[in-house]
Swiss-Prot record:
EC number assigned by the record: 2.7.11.1
Compositionally skewed regions (Polar residues) per UniProt: 87-99
Claim: Lyase is one of the keywords in the record: no
Organism placement in taxonomy: Eukaryota, Metazoa, Ecdysozoa, Arthropoda, Hexapoda
Listed name of the protein: Serine/threonine-protein kinase GL21140
Catalytic activity: L-seryl-[protein] + ATP = O-phospho-L-seryl-[protein] + ADP + H(+); L-threonyl-[protein] + ATP = O-phospho-L-threonyl-[protein] + ADP + H(+)
Residue ranges, compositional bias (Low complexity): 18-52, 100-128
Keyword match ATP-binding: yes
InterPro entries: Doublecortin_dom (IPR003533), Doublecortin_dom_sf (IPR036572), Kinase-like_dom_sf (IPR011009), Prot_kinase_dom (IPR000719), Ser/Thr_kinase_AS (IPR008271)
UniProt: ATP binding residues: 490-498, 513
Listed Basic and acidic residues bias regions: 53-66, 74-84
UniProt record, GO biological process: intracellular signal transduction
Alphabetic keyword roster: ATP-binding, Kinase, Nucleotide-binding, Phosphoprotein, Repeat, Serine/threonine-protein kinase, Transferase
Pfam family, one: DCX
Length: 755
């Protein structure tokens, strides 16, 4: 049965009321019948409008809809109810449909003329009144049904999304339909916003995969009740066991006023370091949603406080149960993958890949069973991983010579015991005035040695540098010339010079960087990238960009001014810093890097020359800021360009196997080493490039006495984890901030690596 585009009433639907009006002549009954007829007419008009709206929606929308039969049956049911009511009112009636029109006729057998009696009149009047009330009541009921959503539209799919590669994130569920999202871009934007509220992501969502890694290219491919994986910055699909058992799909909502406990839990399991945004360590991080008070669970409070007091970033060595010699793997544990004992077992399962499946039992090297979270962060750093198989306590805990050699090789760079330094004290590299872009790093050769010759008169050198730029005061942009006064040159590089300037109104000093475009032909994209990146950055430990003016010959950048100069000069003056001073600087540097990396930006040229410091009256460093973003870029895939400064370059850059954000952590580890002893961990005779690169690739270095004899094990452990040759187990920037030495909690300790 089909309802067509319009509904036309060709005859009075309630003709019985008209017939009774002529037969009885009762005014009361006539009025009631007229009201009922009017209500019925209004009802039919609304049904007609509803049907027209339905057809328009079907014409303009080519989407999957609810069953037409079920949708069309609703108006038919309404008409049937109306017919029944009319029939009960008149005793007989019909409502017919033909060619999209409704026709109705009814007749009433009334008393012959002149035989009307008071009794019959009362009966007819009461019947008519009751029928009228029934029609009015039915009309009101049907109006409610009409106002409800009966227009067939596509039902929104409830779809769960996971973060790519994150096996601990419980996922987030949203309704998806073509009405809600007109394009993939709008869905990407919404997913980016929602994921940022629950978990740290490296950038915007750019790709969606199904659970087997197939790329989704259209909204129609998303199926109701299914789960999908969101990928940021076009990263490849990571096949892991996603947390599909965290909560039933039907129970998850996105209502802002009813966030589920799993969402709060997801954020609590990934606490941002209190140092990440420059907040002092003394200020305890406040859990999202009010912490324990928000979820009302003292158990959660105790569990997370235990994690915060026990868990600190560290690398553990895992021996996979199997045929000897057994496979040995390293794993980085931190607050993001180790919020609980079960999470650690899951992380171990992913890397050891037992034939029997999930890791069920873990033992220390001495055969002691690991039963709680704190056992992974004690003095032991080597563990045996077992599934459901039986443990042979006699043979399994004995290491073969090949296994022992492999573990000793891993521990070699984790030794805290100093070795005597042979020969003279190594020297700091000569201060570099330039960062070497791709293709120029290895061609540097011995230019740094020659640069150590005494310069000419400083004033003459500055005048020559200023003249070499071809910039006259009159040529400066009006926005700079009218608002600032020029002062001395405070720095120079390969493509630019930096002058100190002052605001004419406030007297506040700033730095003016003048980039000569003629000196960087073919490298203009580095200038554009520097400006583009700096415009995005707002952090207390990153130099701020105040103004940029682009002209045909030069690019002008007005930057924040830091009075203490760069860290290289500070190291030259004091040779080495105390642990407390070094802690302040690595906190600030780690905070800046963590901020950059959270935005998917890698600096690629972190070195003392690009770190500016503020000093107090006693010459102590009170603040450090990261500067010079000439090589910075956004990471959307592995990078291969060989660039940076030789002393601070990471091994994966030299090996040209692809690198990412963690090259900045390596450079920061080199700097921390230098701060404490006055020379870098990797040196070569006469600063020769190839031997230096070979030493970096080997990853072997020492903490030689007497230069390290008074330096504690905590900072050595941090350096060892920052200078891991394998990027997968190297600390992240947040791990630097979470390390017990950085936080000043050295009583926690991290085990003895001297054995």
């Amino acid at each position: 049965m089909e309802v067509h585009n319009s509904l036309h009433c060709t005859a009075p639907v309630l003709s019985s009321l008209q017939a009774s009006a002529s037969g009885s002549g009762t005014p009361k009954k006539t009025a009631a019948s007229s009201a009922a007829a009017q209500n019925s007419k209004q009802l039919l008009d609304q049904l007609s409008q509803q049907q027209k709206a339905q057809e328009e929606a079907e014409t303009h929308s080519r989407r999957d809809c609810d069953s037409p039969a079920s949708s069309n049956s609703e108006p038919e049911k309404d008409l049937d109810e109306l017919r029944d009511l009319n029939g009960s009112l008149t005793g007989s009636g019909s409502v017919g449909k033909s060619n999209g029109s409704l026709s109705g006729a009814s007749s009433t057998t009334s008393a012959p003329a002149g035989t009307s009696t008071p009794g019959s009149a009362n009966t007819n009047g009461s019947a008519s009144g009751a029928a009228s009330l029934s029609v009015v009541s039915a009309t009101a009921h049907l109006k409610k049904r009409i106002t409800s959503s009966r227009t067939p539209t596509r039902k929104a799919h409830r779809i769960k999304f996971y973060r790519n590669g994150d096996r601990f994130y419980p996922g987030i569920t949203i309704p998806v339909s073509n009405e809600r999202y007109r394009s993939f871009e709008s869905l990407y934007e919404d997913l980016t916003r929602l994921l940022e509220e629950n978990v740290k992501i490296p950038g915007a969502v750019r790709t969606i995969y199904d659970m087997v890694g197939k790329k989704i290219t259209a909204l129609e491919e998303l199926e109701d009740g299914q789960s999908y994986v969101c990928s940021c910055n076009n990263e490849n699909f990571k096949k892991v066991d996603y947390n599909t058992s965290s909560q039933p799909l039907a129970n998850l909502t996105l209502a802002n006023n009813s966030r589920t406990s799993s969402h709060r839990l997801a954020k609590l399991q990934r606490p941002a370091s209190p140092l990440k945004n420059g907040v002092p360590n003394s200020i305890a991080p406040v859990p999202v949603g009010g912490g324990a008070a928000a979820n009302g669970s003292p158990l959660n409070t105790s569990r997370f406080s235990e994690r915060d007091s026990v868990v600190h970033p560290r690398i553990v060595t895992l021996i996979r149960n199997g045929t000897k010699p057994r496979r040995i793997i390293r794993l980085l544990l931190n607050k993001r993958n180790s919020p609980s004992f079960d999470h650690v077992l899951t992380a171990i399962t992913q890397v050891v890949r037992l034939d029997t499946g999930y890791v069920r039992k873990v033992f220390t090297l001495s055969g002691v069973s690991v039963l709680q979270l704190s056992d992974f962060f004690g003095s032991d750093d080597v563990f045996f991983a077992y599934g459901t198989e039986r443990v042979n306590t006699v043979d399994d805990f004995k290491l073969e010579s090949e296994e022992q050699r492999a573990i000793n090789a891993i521990r070699k760079t984790l030794r805290t015991a100093g070795t005597a330094c042979k020969g003279p004290k190594p020297k700091m590299p000569v201060k570099s005035k330039k960062a070497y872009p791709p293709g120029e790093l290895k061609a540097q050769a011995e230019a740094q040695l020659q640069a150590s010759a005494a310069p000419a008169n400083e004033d003459e050198e500055q005048a020559a540098l200023l003249k070499s730029t071809g910039v006259e005061v009159a040529e400066l942009p009006a926005a700079i010339r009218d608002n600032y006064t020029l002062s001395q040159i405070i720095g120079d590089g390969n493509f630019a010079i930096v002058l100190k300037i002052k605001d004419r109104q406030t007297g506040i000093p700033h730095a003016l960087k003048i980039i000569d475009k003629s000196k960087c032909k073919g490298k203009e994209h580095y200038i554009d990238a520097e400006v583009r990146v700096m415009k995005k950055l707002h952090h207390p430990h990153i130099i701020s960009l105040i103004m940029d003016v682009d002209q045909d010959t030069n690019m002008y950048l007005v930057l924040e001014y830091v009075s203490g100069g760069d860290l290289f000069d500070a190291i030259t003056q004091v040779t080495r810093f105390s642990e407390s001073q070094s802690r302040i600087m690595i906190r600030h540097l780690g905070s800046a890097m963590s901020y950059l990396h959270s935005m998917g930006i890698v600096h690629r040229d972190i070195k003392p020359e690009n770190l500016l410091v503020e000093l107090d009256d006693f010459g102590n460093v009170v603040q450090l800021k990261l500067a010079d973003f000439g090589l910075a870029c956004e990471v959307t895939e592995p990078l291969y360009a060989v660039c940076g400064t030789p002393t601070y370059v990471a091994p994966e850059i030299l090996l040209e196997v692809g690198y990412g954000l963690k090259i900045d952590v390596w450079a920061a580890g080199i700097i921390l080493y230098i701060l404490l002893c006055g020379f870098p961990p990797f040196v070569a005779p006469d600063n020769q490039q190839e031997p230096l690169f070979d030493a970096i690739i080997s990853g072997v270095y020492e903490f030689p006495d007497p230069y390290w004899s008074d330096i504690g094990d905590g900072v050595r452990d941090l350096i060892a984890n920052m200078l891991q040759s394998d990027p997968d187990v190297r600390f992240t920037s947040e791990d630097i901030l979470d390390h017990y030495w950085t936080m000043g909690n050295e009583e926690i300790g991290c085990g003895d690596y001297s054995r």
